[in-house]
Swiss-Prot record:
Residues 165-167 are annotated as: CNP motif. The lineage of its organism: Viruses, Riboviria, Orthornavirae, Duplornaviricota, Resentoviricetes. It comes from Rotavirus A (strain RVA/Cow/France/RF/1975/G6P6[1]) (RV-A). Homotrimer; disulfide-linked. 2 Ca(2+) ions bound at each subunit interface in the trimer hold the trimer together. Interacts with the intermediate capsid protein VP6. Interacts with the outer capsid protein VP5*. Glycans are attached at N238, N318. The keyword Glycoprotein applies. GO terms for cellular component: host cell endoplasmic reticulum lumen; T=13 icosahedral viral capsid; viral outer capsid. Residues 1-50 form the signal peptide. This is Outer capsid glycoprotein VP7. Disulfide bonds join C82-C135, C165-C249, C191-C244, C196-C207. N-glycosylated. Gene3D superfamilies: Glycoprotein VP7, domain 1 (3.40.50.11130), Rotavirus outer-layer protein VP7, domain 2 (2.60.120.800). Ca(2+) 2 binds at Q177, D228, V229, D231, D301. The keyword Translocase does not apply.
Amino acid sequence: MYGIEYTTILIFLTSITLLNYMLKSITRIMDYIIYRFLLIVVILATIIKAQNYGVNLPITGSMDTAYADSTQSEPFLTSTLCLYYPVEASNEIADTEWKDTLSQLFLTKGWPTGSVYLKEYADIAAFSVEPQLYCDYNLVLMKYDSTQELDMSELADLILNEWLCNPMDITLYYYQQTDEANKWISTGSSCTVKVCPLNTQTLGIGCLITNPDTFETVATTEKLVITDVVDGVNHKLNVTTATCTIRNCKKLGPRENVAVIQVGGANILDITADPTTTPQTERMMRINWKKWWQVFYTVVDYVNQIIQTMSKRSRSLNSSAFYYRV
């Protein structure tokens, strides 16, 4: 009887000893593998110059901080450049290989093939509805047209500045603008905007709040409208909501990774809404050439000087980024 109990205890102790030995052996093997792997990673990290691809990933929204690539010092190898041009440019050039030619010319200025993107838009009005500025640096070419001067000015004001915007429910609420930086921005296929200022008794000043036909018309069938009214006064609004969206926006400051190059015209457009301030012409430039090849040649020649006036931002800028700040 005692012999059986002693044998059982001895087997139990032997099993524990063997299990402990096996666990220690496995631990030593795993430590050896992990340490060797880490050693190889450390050695390779000192040899290979890794690029942080996350720097150029598109991000929906808007961030103020400028991000620098910590693993590469070459300014253009980790940057992207978008050049936006009207469709009339490609129609005039009429060459299926012209983009490849332009890409090779940018290469002579230090911009590798694949880092420059040429993006076409139909016209100023169409570009205003859905501006998409995804690159680290964005250059927008605008052909001057005296009949579209105000449209060009509004578009430049939109893309050259950072806006914090919120949706507006104009069927339920009255709205007022608090200061000069506060604007109402409408975009869509057809925007007609009417306003009715209200007194302290919420009665219309020169209009009837129940009759939109008596409202003051500030825009008619436009694709982009930046509305500025008297600050501190409530307004009842009427907008063609079926084809247009209006938002209450606050201008936060310049969007420094965007520049506008005006093609033609006697003077650079002034996009400043406040008549008492100095004209805003930062990151607005002018090129006077009749032919589009001449325009593109000049852009290539001065591209590196132009981006010195800009700041690289690692973010994607589409229409939602203009309107919703993250």
